[in-house]
Amino acid sequence: VKIGKVPETVLKRSVFKQIRKRQKEVLTKPGIGHDYSGIEASSQDVITIATAPVSGAIDDIGPIAVHMAVNNLVLSGATPLGIMQTMLLPEGFREAELKIIIKAIEAQCLLLNIEVMGGHTEVSAAVNCPVLVITGLGKVKKTQMLSPANIIAGQEIVMTKWAGIKGTYLLAKDHESELISRYNRDFIQGAKDLLKYLSVSKDAKAAADFGVTAMHDAARGGIFAALWEFAEAAKMGLKVYLKKIGLKQETVEICNYFNINPYQMTSEGSLLIAVGKGDLLVDHLRKQGIEASVIGQFMEGNDRLIINDDEIRYLEPPRTDEIYKVI
């Protein structure tokens, strides 16, 4: 199996096929495009849970992991409450570096108004860089919990922000010394500044307040992977207009430089939303300072189409994230 997400066929055959449901209080089950689980806490309330793993540099790992977990959590329509963290550190890892990671985690939790509720930290010979797993918990009214299972044909797909947000940031940060030979420092800084857009909490709250059917965030594999997963979870087809998908100029330039596809590059920070009246939702989001556009709609059947002017092609199951060609 290649680096990145385990292929959908493997997940279905070797993971999901073996899992059985036992507890009636557990309202959701694992599946493609299912980003969170829900546990019935009372006749009215549901506790939602989501998890996300990250490995890498100490200055990135905390903020990225927190946002990935909370991003998955808020897709249910839930208000996030707190996180648990599990961290595996390589031998020789310094206490000062651990402090940096925890400080960054706490800083992101402060911004999101959530608690660090606990966790586990250990040094392991099995890893050669820090590995951080964040589990987020939240709460939502049962009547307000969102699910892709409720999507119907004809509903529109609204996308917030732009494709390739996280990938552009990582490439600009990790390859700055190489990119500086072609682009000026302001351009590279603009790409690195995309880190501040990784959270979809504001997007999701605005969408939930408006009244939408379901949401799915774009993460590993990019916008194309997210669209496929959204359609899988909904058991629907879709058609998407390529030119409606937002791209920052920094993303276009850097992807061209490295010869990678921005639509298949990690895109944390962008949210896909299923809604009846996409234009009205876009207006609602833009009034709150969130860039958004209608990029397509769901339809009956299994066809998942990408339309680029007169060219129509089929969306394929997610591939290895394009960023692994470079980092």
Kindly give the residue locations of the regions a language model identified.
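Extreme N-terminal cap/leader segments of soluble proteins
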Residues: 1-57, 85, 106-110, 114, ...
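Glycine-rich anion-binding loops of enzyme active sites
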Residues: 42-50, 54, 79-176, 297
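Active-site-proximal betaalpha loop/short-helix elements
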Residues: 90-92, 191-267
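Active-site glycine-rich loop that binds ribose-phosphate moieties when present
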Residues: 133-147, 182-206
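Helix N-cap motif at beta-to-alpha junctions
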Residues: 274-280
